[in-house]
Amino acid sequence: MYRVRSMESTATSSPSSSLMVHPTNFRVIIVGGSIAGLTLAHCLSKIGVDYVILEKRQQIAPQEGASIGILPHGGRILDQLGLFNAIQRNVEPLTTAHISYPNGFTHTNQSPTLIHERFGLPLAFLERRKLLQILYWSLPDTSRVQVGKTVVSVDHIWGDSGMAVRTRDGSTFYGDIVVGADGVHSRVRHEMWRLAEIDLPGSITEREKDGMTVDYICVFGISASVPDLRPGEQVASLHDGRSFLVFPGKDGRVFWFLLKKLDRRYTYTSAPRLTPLDIDTIAGSFISDHIWNGVSFGSLWERREVTGVTNLEENVFSTWHSGRIVCIGDSMHKMAPNTGQGANCAIEDAAALANAIHGAIEHVDRPSMAEVQSFLRSFNESRLPRVREIYKSASVVVRLHARENLALRLVGRYYLPYSGDVPANTASKLIADGVQLSFLAPSLHSGPGWEKYSMKNGVAKSTVVWTSLGILGLVVFLFLLFRVRARFSSF
């Protein structure tokens, strides 16, 4: 018999909010103790919604060598939740961006400082592990997070009155909706597809299921302090077929990524199976590559503290929900790390879903199946256009950084260094329309950029068009110029 457990007590409100919360009989099963999953848990706590998090690993925040960028739109949501101050204590805000090229040419701009001034929140970089720890330990009730719970199946309860989630250890969890926040290899996504095929055959096409591809692999890590790499100054080092992203952070620790193009495009299922044994082989090929200011990749490598390797899956799925199941974060959109948007999109997903849930239960204690499907559909439709735009930007930048073709090499070398505030403006347009939590007071950190660079007004849109036309014109000009030369010199 399906029975919903009520919340323990009224959740504490955000320091920046006077929201009065009232526990409801609506229960959410969150699969995955990820950034998306834990952020959603904080949001649900604020509106009195019962939840449980099922995490397959034995600990929430293992040391895996990964790092995370928090941009103003992600930071604004975390600030609404009363979490950003804890994050600020663990970061060195970015102020300067350096770009280096294979021929030794370098360029510096102040995009991070401009973005901070425009939006009132900095670009911050920290260990993924540290962010997970902050999200976990600041929960009102950590007992709602259950580790060692590997999900094996998700099913409807008879009569469509709820969902049952079963785990490998034999446990069963019941709730009104299931949220898949379990990453790129999502089990919930698989179960959503399975149930959708039963309920409405063909509703999720094979083309959609096979949409995720892999063009790049990434070796990433954290190194001890490297002389001549200054905290707060990020570096993008561009090479043919690969790039390095370097972020000197708090206490001199350096977060870095080596992104390497593969020999061809792979599908998700056919991509190389990487293991820790591959790390030394991949990294060892590029030890002598110049990064910045006399620093080579070898300087980072010899000071490495922890490393990892992964395929860089790329895709935005179209269908994020079916029935009472909805997926968020990397389970629905996976993008290259070059624009730092992955975690921020996941945080936005959690906030947008919480807004939808809050709207659905505001006047109804337990929404019906039709009402659940309605608000999940609206959530899906509202998120898709924005995430696609952010994804496209990341897709272009990872290829620009790896100088993937002639046009991108020309743009990267002969347009980007002389483009003024265009990089900051482009980033600002993607930041400005970020989601806010509708049920909490706005962040006290603000700036003129939220309004000025919003894509909801015609000025920002026309700026995008003219910038694109300018780049296109420059590419055509440079292409014609270089065509008359018998050989291309190094650039």
Swiss-Prot record:
It is a single-pass membrane protein. It comes from the Eukaryota. Pathway: Secondary metabolite biosynthesis; terpenoid biosynthesis. Glycans are attached at N380. The chain crosses the membrane at residues 462-482. Chevalone E derivatives produced by this cluster are interesting candidates for cancer therapy since they synergistically enhance the cytotoxicity of doxorubicin (DOX) in both MDA-MB-231 and MCF-7 breast cancer cell lines. GO terms for biological process: biosynthetic process. Its main location: membrane. One of its GO terms (cellular component) is membrane. Its EC number is 1.-.-.-. FAD binds at E55, G69, R128, D330, A343. Its cofactor is FAD. Keywords: FAD, Flavoprotein, Glycoprotein, Membrane, Monooxygenase, Oxidoreductase, Transmembrane, Transmembrane helix. GO terms for molecular function: FAD binding; monooxygenase activity. It is found in: Membrane. InterPro entries: FAD-bd (IPR002938), FAD/NAD-bd_sf (IPR036188), FAD_mOase_fung (IPR050562). It is an enzyme of class 1 (oxidoreductase). Gene3D superfamilies: FAD/NAD(P)-binding domain (3.50.50.60). Belongs to the paxM FAD-dependent monooxygenase family. FAD-dependent monooxygenase; part of the cluster A that mediates the biosynthesis of chevalone E and its oxidized derivatives that possess a unique five-membered lactone ring and can synergistically enhance the cytotoxicity of doxorubicin (DOX) in breast cancer cells. Within the pathway, cle3 takes part to the biosynthesis of the molecular scaffold by catalyzing the formation of an (S)-epoxide ring at the terminal olefin of the geranylgeranyl group. This is FAD-dependent monooxygenase cle3.
